[in-house]
Amino acid sequence: MPEIKDKKSAERKSFFFRRSKSAPKNQEISITENDVLSDSSLYGKIDLDSAAQSEQQEKPIKHRPRKPVSKKDLPSKQKKEARQPKAEKKTEITEQPKKNGRGRPKKNAEPLFEEDIIVQKPAEKKKKSTKSEKPAKAPKTTKKQTDKTPLKIIPLGGLGEIGKNMTLIEYKNDIVIIDCGLAFPDDDMPGIDLVIPDFSYVIKNRDKVRGVVLTHGHEDHIGALSYLLKEVNVPVYSARLTIGLVEGKLKEAGILNESKLVVKKPGDVVKMGSISVEFIAVNHSIPDACGFAIFTPVGTLVHTGDFKIDYTPVDGQMIDLARFGELGRHGVLALMSDSTNAERPGMTPSERRVGESFEMLFKKAGDRRILVASFSSNVHRIQQIIDTAVRHGRKVVVSGRSMENVTAKASELGYLKYPENTIVDIDQMRGIPDENLVIITTGSQGEPMSALTRMARGEHRKISVTAHDYIIISATPIPGNEKLVGKVINDLMTLGAEVIYESSMGIHVSGHACREEIRTIFGLVKPKFFIPVHGEYKHLAKNRDLAVEMGVPFENIIVGENGHVIELTEDSVKSVTTVPCDAVMVDGIGIGDVGSIVLRDRKLLSEEGLMVVVATIDSKTGAVVAGPDVVSRGFVYVRESEELLAEAREVCRKALSAAEGANGNREWANLKQAVKDQLGSYLFSKTKRRPMILPIIQEI
């Protein structure tokens, strides 16, 4: 080969190649046709056959510059060749740097640049893995879909309402249930104890259900679980305190022994068929609250659960914002975020602010007995009440069944900490002076049977409110409970007690994120699609608007409804069909046996009263042989309405006679309807009221 004075120039004419960013300096680089083609976007395509032929002829290669092209612009044939390099098109080593004794370049070797290319015979190329990169602390995300099966998100409760939270995540033959809560009855549900979701779809697909994951231990998220597990017995996964509270409910329902409860902590991942769920720590008004990262074949979902961002939490456990950000960097297909406070600007104050208010109010109470009403599940609030009581030398009494249960379980699991003998039994408080006593009680929402409400009515068996009581209601009324709370406050003040209930006193903070906190989650997660959850429609709509402000396209957001099936793919989100989701009412031990007709009758009875008409007719002649008698309940006072009732009896007699058919035959339905129509018209003309009319006709 003729001597080349400028060796670098010759190499530059032979090959143009850009060193890979991932290759360390001073490392030998193998060049194959695949490598050259893959970098043709910057330097143009190189004909390796021509290069090899030129070397055999001992002539330098003349390179003709070409316009740079993108790899995606290459013909499909060239792309295929780039993926499958041919063995015969390998080049020989033309130059190597000096090496140390172990066969590696010396550390002080001159760095490789684009013009300093070392070409060597490539080693056998390893087959590239087709699996996607595994996120830290999470199961490997699935590769790109090929069958295009959509992921189904089916809310059975919690949308367009407060409470009854329950959502299904379904992919092919796998269903994972998120939460299973209850709701309290509305004013138009007389006699109803509580409301739970409709489990019809779950029961129909029981073979697909892989498990239940719970975000936290509030009633609107775990209250209906015992009813579900009686129908579909599947594993339940959640954090320690949540599982502890669930144990009590299942024990009361008599199904604890046959239930499978599994304790998980933040960072743990549960694989349920094709769906995996990772627990992520969040702040809320109860310890051990979690959000979820849900890994599916379609993509990753993030469900925040009920959350807030508290930088000074009472228990020192902060929300794992770093993990939310990490998920965002790996790519999140859809975000499902708490919408409860999406209307409120700014950030939710820290729970510690309430503790500071307690300190001020306890000092103001002086030598009076202190009563504090709060949500029984707000363990952080209870801890701060106890801490303040200890600092002021007061013993603590707990009143109210749910408060007693939660306090006992939280103490057992180590979530409530206090000096020994701080909490005393309610029967021991008689010997404790008022200035040394604090009573923590239920009833912050004015519930009719709660401890505080019974105290206000003078019906509590062991606690009587006096003018020497200082009462703090550490909660704000849930929408719809304002009248109940107001009545309790009025009754307590009538008894002479001083009641502190104003929100301006700092005695309550929310456990839900306001707009700036939701913005923070959006900034970290960066979802492609957004599905607002947990709230009335106005809350969901405000959260949708916030998502648009944060850059999520409007068409990528769907405000769902209970029972509407949301289908999610890599490229779309839409509502396609519905499943049964009627509210199931629980009345005593009856579940679902009270429907809209029964409620209508109850409402009618409560508003207009009842009139019962009893008559006996001869089966042969059709003549009325006894009655008709009229009985009134809740309609008019009998002693003052004798004339009205006498006329009502005559109207019924005429109606029965007029309805007699040919040959004395009578249709019972016609008889009853005739009595209802004619008596109803008469009573309305006299009273402008429409009582329920119940005809009872016997035949002899």
Feature-to-residue mapping (PLM):
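N-terminal acidic, proline/glycine-rich, low-complexity intrinsically disordered segments
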Residues: 1-29
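Hydrophobic/aromatic hotspots within intrinsically disordered, low-complexity regions
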Residues: 4, 15, 29-31, 36-37, ...
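Arg/Lys-rich, glycine/proline-spaced intrinsically disordered segments
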Residues: 63-69, 73-74, 81-88, 92-96, ...
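His/Asp/Glu-rich metal-coordinating catalytic cores
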Residues: 116, 121-213, 218-431, 450-464, ...
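A glycine- and charged-residue-rich anion-binding loop/surface
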Residues: 159, 183-194, 208, 501-504, ...
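Short glycine-rich phosphate-binding loop at a beta-alpha junction
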Residues: 235, 531, 694-697
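Hard-cation-handling environments
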Residues: 344-474, 478-503, 507-663, 672, ...
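C-terminal tails and terminal domains of large nucleic-acid-associated
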Residues: 664-700
